[in-house]
Amino acid sequence: MSELSRQLDLILRGVVEVIQRAELESKLVRSLKENRPLRVKAGFDPTAPDLHLGHTVLIHKLKHFQELGHQVIFLIGDFTGMIGDPTGQSETRVALSKEKVLENAKTYERQIFKILDPAKTLVEFNSRWMSPMTAEGLIHLSAHSSVARMLERDDFHKRYHEQKPISIHEFMYPLVQGYDSVALKSDVELGGTDQKFNLLMGRELQRDYGQEPQVVITMPLLEGTDGVKKMSKSAGNYIALEDSPNEMFGKLMSISDLLMLRYYELLTTEDLAGVKPAHPMEAKQALAALIVARYHGAEAGQQARVAFQQKFSEREFPAEPDVSLILTQADLREGQTISLVDLVAKTGLVPSKSEARRLIIQGGLEVDEQKQGDATAVLSMVPGKVYRLKIGRRKFALVEFSGS
């Protein structure tokens, strides 16, 4: 296999689209001939302090380029973060303050180096060239596109026809992202499929500014733990890189068997041919251990697996439950009793009494390994006795009545 073929095989693994494939091959040939690494960028707006597994689809593709000897640029969009990416939005996003954006950005460098080699990664902030830009410069930049062109975007087009407001500054977002490619002289830009319009804007602006246009590579969007929506903090379906090992393992074990295969494909280099014949539970545990090990170390991955097997697979009550609670007479009714609904609610492991009631009715409560399905039932508490509660599939509590 030639070096060109080897590089293409790794670069194209898991991608959705390359614009244009011939240009990518041409750039790689020139790179090999001149011994000049390609400049490959991917941008991330620090709208929240946590990076999650959804972000790592792009970061791992950056890693592929890095392994091939190219210069990867992790661009922190501290300037674009203050605009707010309108992609997929049905209304204008609330702009973040500069202080909040910078606060979030501080955690990004620490997190990305769980994957990328810090010695071979260029970290940039787009405020470096955007903040000094004058009003004249912004006018010049905005002259490179038109309102008609912006309305070709699906989200803008939909909002316009639904007579929902579109703020002028939102039109600036694709232009600023595109100008990032000009400022960095990027050869390749990576992004999710939902970023295609913005990525193509980079190609257009590079042409306008006399540069060779970048190749655009789009990557699939990773579904969150619900298996439906794109992984995001706002959707509550994300797995953060800085989740604890046990929390990360538990979230990964909660995904569907079908989504498990998707995670194997997008988040690992494992051969799917070897995964599909395996028992789903075993394959899922292997996936969870693999991902936990990547971000917390091999030992943490194995410990999380053992803890999960003890807590869920073997149905043993864990040595360290989620909550340990001591009730007093003031917490009980007359006769030293308490309703199951109140008992579950007092653990704090459900958000409300109504949720506790729903959980009990659906058979999601066990007291001392006995399933409870009557939401009107009461429990007689014996002073000094410790009651073991399993609440839902993954939460455990120890409750003791002090007797006073």
Please name every model-derived segment.
Residues 15, 95-218, 227:
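Divalent-metal (Mg2+/Mn2+/Ca2+)-assisted nucleotide/phosphate chemistry catalytic cores
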Residues 58-62, 175, 198-205, 263, ...:
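Buried hydrophobic packing segments
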Residues 1-41:
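Positively charged, low-complexity intrinsically disordered leader regions
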Residues 205-404:
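Conserved nucleotide- and phosphate/pyrophosphate-binding catalytic cores
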Residues 35-43, 72, 173-183, 281-284:
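Short, hydrophobic/aliphatic alpha-helical segments
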Residues 24-86, 190-196, 202:
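N-terminal catalytic cores of NTP/NDP-binding nucleotidyl/phosphoryl-transfer enzymes
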Residues 63-110, 115-116:
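Well-ordered mid-protein domain cores that form the structural environment of catalytic cofactors
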Residues 21, 75-77, 124-126, 219:
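Conserved beta-strand termini and adjacent loop/short-helix elements that scaffold enzyme active sites
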